[in-house]
Amino acid sequence: MVDMLGFISDQLDQLGVPYEFGEWTGEISYPYFVGSFNETEHRLEDGYTGGVFTLDGWSRGSKLTLAEINDKLKKAFEDLRAVQEGTAFFITYWNGLMIPTGEEDLFRITITLNTNEWKGA
């Protein structure tokens, strides 16, 4: 899981997405994104771990910023395959969903990625 989270963090950094895992600890500056991970399957025999990575983003003033980042992530994670230090990653974009916040100028999006990781590749 740690390798997968590090790989995704590197990808988000390269794309210029302001991101932290678990919770935002820095000074609030919009937009910002916080990630979480849910492991859905683990197989010891072939080193496979499957999961769902969720990225929650917030923006003030405009939904467009979130939609633009969603489009950027959709393209980057459309069919991302990589091998790093003996671990293979296959990540696909699943969906992006705008979620009402109840505040007039605060906007939220949840972006979901399917993750697949094989150790010892």
Where do the model's predicted regions map?
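Charged, amphipathic alpha-helical segments and their flanking helix caps
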Residues: 1-23, 27, 37-121
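Low-complexity, acidic Ser/Thr/Pro/Gly-rich terminal tails and inter-domain linkers that flank the onset
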Residues: 31-34
